[in-house]
Amino acid sequence: MGQETEAVGQMEKLLALFAAERMKSLAAPEVQALVECWKQYITAYHYNCTDEILSALGQMYASDERFAQNIDRFGQGTARFMSGAIAFYCSR
């Protein structure tokens, strides 16, 4: 499996996990651990993901319709939930 295929598979796995957790509190330890996994995923496959970059990405996931639609394929409201969870993570 190539690195790009691996990256897409990992991304989809994480997005599915965000979708599965979307009814939980943004502050729930398992949700915040998932945000940390997302940050590590971006660093491993794309670029060094600082909290500042992560915060900007989180805002974009909910505000940019293209991102929101793609993320919400995993479950309606996942993009907004993910954005909120990232904002909570970055505010600590």
What function would you assign to each model-found segment?
Residues 1-92:
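Amphipathic alpha-helical "stalk" segments
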